[in-house]
Amino acid sequence: MTVCLRQSESVSDQSLRLDPYRSGLNLTTEFQQLATRQSALPVSQLVEQQTALSGPAGLFVKLSHQLRLYGRQAPSLEDLEWLRGRKRQSLAERAVQFALGQHCRRPEADNPFKGMLREDLCCIVFDDRSLHTLVERYAAREALRQHDSEYFVKLIATTRETVERRIVFHGLLEHFDRLLPIEKSIYPLHYRAVQQAHLDHEETLYGKLILDQPISALLNVHSPEWLLNNLSSFELSIDWERVGQVMTRNVR
């Protein structure tokens, strides 16, 4: 994902803090502890950490460059030498094979972190105290990007052949609420408030959605088309006379 606008260093944005009471979170102790530590840091420091890891001159780009040039002999793979235990060594080696395959230095290989919970992937990618090697963090980052990409593809599909956007704005808010503070730090200032305003407008037009499950959980079970076709089962109430009046004013 391309780095977005930086948050103002002088502004304290409460939306960066993790709210454990919002739906859709798979809160492990490790994830909560990481989120708590990051919440105590200023936004400017979080942005610096994000840039050092994922920026254009960050560790992941450096690793990719070395893998293309040197393959298995890349200097950034030296931390594998300190691993002990067959299980740890095996996982790291699978991550190496995946990364080498991505850079055409080996046949393509499966990502060993594919299918993990987003929160668990975040703990590997963004926790500097983690015992995982750089190449494992890289592979986990790729799994995280794939996870988010698949989610957004499904979310965008709910906007096809319909004028209303309640599902997509619910989904955008849900995704943002799941992010670690370091991930939120590169979003535009007041991003959440803007998306909430869009959702409020949509629900004024079409009625409030009452969801007993997160959008992500629904999209794991049902197709975007199914959600659109069954919106009425999630609607609290719709005053169609009022909707018609609002839409008439908008047309004018």
Model-derived features: positions:
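Type III/flagellar secretion export determinants
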Residues: 1-252
